[in-house]
Amino acid sequence: AGFAEYAVLPKEALVKIDSHIPFEHAALFGCGVVTGVGAVINTAKATEEDSVAIVGLGGVGLSALLASIAIGSKKTIAIDLSDEKLALAKELGANHTLNPKDENFLETFLDITSGGANIAVETAGSGHALKTAYDITRRGGTTVAAGMPGPKVEITLSHLSIAAEERVIKGSYMGSCIAQRDIPKYLDMFQTGKLPVDRLLSRKIKFEDLNEAMDRLDDAKTVREVLIP
């Protein structure tokens, strides 16, 4: 995120990629894709037997959505306040899309999942989003916090429900990924069509478009934009 044409890095921080992969697609894997995909595959260890809910549909959340679909989760449910993002999630293959602002949101969610999601992944970096993820997780299920909030954001959870319902709450930093191990794996999934992250690329921009791009990102009007010097 330094917006530099070149960077000096130790070799341990580099991952060799197939020369056939366009740079504008490879660039997506440096943060958002590994965080979202890793949260589902590494942190939550989701399987085809799980129902997976993604709360927050930015670049990280939509990457998590693609991961859930790629592993064949029983159900993939997308949750966001933006109807445009929900429409994109549906296009990408989500089984259900829900807006928390809708009337009877929780009741509807619990109905379509028969009591809650096995796994709920929060990717918005919002205390409200994490609370929503916890509330829609079923008894014995796992809630993953993958979003990065401000240092003073706090939430209140029921101690009783954590204990009595045998809940699991896990943090996920960069998708619990080891770059040299996981990025080649995810790139292979991309090349074989299992992880179509290129569909998350909203536009390619030049340096002179940078401020407008940052505004779009701040207003949640874009998913991923790649700077081409």
Predicted region positions:
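N-terminal Rossmann-fold NAD(P) dinucleotide-binding loop
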Residues: 61-62
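NAD(P)H dinucleotide-binding glycine-rich loop of Rossmann-like/cofactor-binding domains
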Residues: 1-55, 195
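Local beta-strand N-terminus motif with an aromatic residue
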Residues: 49, 94, 116-117, 197, ...
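ADP-ribose/adenylate-binding Rossmann-like module
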Residues: 137-152
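Adenosine-nucleotide cofactor-binding segment
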Residues: 54-57, 69-132
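Rossmann-fold dehydrogenase core element
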Residues: 142-144, 157-199
